[in-house]
Structures are given as C-alpha cells and as structure tokens.
C-alpha cells in the first residue's frame, strides 16, 4: 500500500480496491492505516479504497472494524471528509451493530451548519438506515428533519426527502400493527 500519501485518481483507487478482493490482511491494513495515520492524504485514500470495495469484502473484512470506524467518524476534529467515512458506515450498518451514540451524533450534527453539506446529508442517510433497525427512533429523526425543512442545498433536500420516506413507511407499519391489535 505504498503511494497512499500521494493524490490518487479514481481509477487508481478502484484498481487498488479490486486488488484487495478477498485479501483479509490487506483490507485490515487499509482499515488500520485509515484509522491510525496522521497523514490526511493517506487516510483519505484508504477511506476511498474501502468505499470502493465490493459489498462482500466490506461485509466480511471491514465489518469487524465498524466500532472503530464509528468512533473515528465521531471525532470532533476529523482530518478527512466525514461524509466519506459515514458512507462506509452506511453500507456496514446492521441491527447487530446499532449504536445509539452514532445515531445521536448524526441527528445533532445533521442540523449543524459547521458540517459540510455532504457530511450532513450522509448523517441523515445513516440515521434513516439506523431507524429501520430501531423503528421507535423514527419520531426523533422526523423532528430533526423538520428542522431542515428550509434547507436549500440539493444534497440535503434529497437526503431529507429520502429519509422522510423511511419515516413514513415506518409510521405506516406501526399504524398497521396497532390496527391488528
């Protein structure tokens, strides 16, 4: 994994992610590099490589790092794009690794204008996915989304709209369950 301190093209990143297919040790090294290096460019490239791994490789080899990646994503002074790290977590989120702290972080920072729009939209997307595992949290997400009603940036508008679809479907399922009782 030399040259990760240099700026890589998308083609190079995709090629590196393909080289790592079914390489548990190599993927583990990339995860460790992303989480532990002080060099922002190396961490960014490592995160980008992890993002482009196949779904199978992520599930098998990146999932064990979920808690470390989640903790890292919630650091106040993250030295790479938070949205990129959150996009990795979105694909890894399951009912088994649900973290209330991460959900709360997403809600709190999704309305924080100090965060980039891409990070905020990824927080909304991740929170919506997490609500699928714990439907009782849909009302909290809806309250957060209400605060974003007048946001004008396309990424946040789209993330909000898609998250509201999740909230509405969860509410509909909840109403159907109540009617059966």
Name each region found by the language model.
Residues 1-181:
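Alpha-helical scaffold domains
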């Amino acid at each position: 994994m030399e040259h990760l301190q240099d700026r890589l093209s998308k083609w190079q990143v995709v090629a590196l992610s393909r080289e790592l297919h079914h390489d548990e040790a190599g993927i583990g090294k990339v995860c460790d590099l992303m989480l532990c290096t002080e060099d922002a460019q190396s961490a960014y490239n490592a995160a980008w490589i992890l993002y482009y791994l196949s779904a199978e490789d992520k599930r098998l080899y990146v999932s064990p790092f979920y808690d470390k990646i989640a903790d890292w994503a919630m650091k106040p002074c993250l030295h790479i794009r938070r949205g990129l790290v959150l996009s990795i977590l979105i694909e890894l989120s399951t009912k088994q690794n649900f973290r209330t702290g991460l959900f709360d972080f997403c809600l709190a920072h999704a309305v924080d204008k100090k965060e980039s729009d891409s990070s905020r939209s990824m927080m909304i997307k991740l929170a919506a996915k997490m609500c699928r595992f714990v439907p009782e949290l849909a009302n909290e997400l809806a309250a957060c989304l209400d605060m974003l009603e007048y946001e004008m940036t396309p990424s946040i508008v789209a993330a909000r709209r898609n998250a509201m679809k999740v909230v509405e479907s969860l509410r509909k399922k909840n109403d159907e369950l109540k009617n059966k009782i």
